[in-house]
Amino acid sequence: MKLLVVAVGHRMPAWVDAGFDEFARRMPRELPLQLIEVKAEPRTSGKPVEAMMAAEAARIEAVLPPRCRRVVLDERGGDRTTAALARRLEAWQGEGEDVAFIVGGPDGLAPSLKASAAESLRLSSLTLPHALVRPLLAEALYRAWTVTRNHPYHRE
């Protein structure tokens, strides 16, 4: 089983890549965390936002494994505590399918992509910079894994 972060956009600041890579490196071999970047649709005047999101959705669909659990990151998604995310992680491991966490572009995700997801997750009620999602999600997944292993990284 793999954890995939499929994110629209590339050429993130060095701190974004360093943060993501640090927590991906800490994950165990049996639960690798991998980043797949998808090119953002150019924001040009006169092009409807819906068309740009649809183009990004097609690129996302093209890189998703055929059988994977889709979890979209969305500001209207469900809140999860670390303990709840750890329980979900254990359940996903029991099912054995890859899990793809899908991060949209500046305008979010196309409705069709949201509808195809098994779950929707909100990282925070705060408005955060788009680039912060990658290292924040990687840390949350690493922390959830440490909870499942009673590792001292997470403290209540």
UniProtKB/Swiss-Prot annotation:
Binding of S-adenosyl-L-methionine occurs at: 73, 104, 123-128
Judged by the first EC level, this protein's enzyme class is transferase
Q: What is its EC number?
A: 2.1.1.177
The GO molecular function terms of this record are: rRNA (pseudouridine-N3-)-methyltransferase activity
**Superkingdom, natural source:** Bacteria
Q: Name the keywords, alphabetized.
A: Cytoplasm, Methyltransferase, rRNA processing, S-adenosyl-L-methionine, Transferase
InterPro entries reported for this sequence = Alpha/beta_knot_MTases, RlmH-like, tRNA_m1G_MTases_N
| Record's subcellular location | Cytoplasm
Q: What does the record give as the reaction this protein catalyses? A: pseudouridine(1915) in 23S rRNA + S-adenosyl-L-methionine = N(3)-methylpseudouridine(1915) in 23S rRNA + S-adenosyl-L-homocysteine + H(+)
Report the GO terms under cellular component.
cytoplasm
- Its job: Specifically methylates the pseudouridine at position 1915 (m3Psi1915) in 23S rRNA.
Q: Into which family does the record put it?
A: Belongs to the RNA methyltransferase RlmH family.
State how it assembles: Homodimer.
Q: Which NCBIfam families match?
A: PRK00103.1-4 (NF000986)
Checking PANTHER family in the record gives:
METHYLTRANSFERASE, RIBOSOMAL RNA LARGE SUBUNIT METHYLTRANSFERASE H
Entry protein name: Ribosomal RNA large subunit methyltransferase H
Species the sequence originates in: Azoarcus sp. (strain BH72)
Provide the taxonomic classification.
Answer: Bacteria, Pseudomonadati, Pseudomonadota, Betaproteobacteria, Rhodocyclales
The gene name on file is rlmH
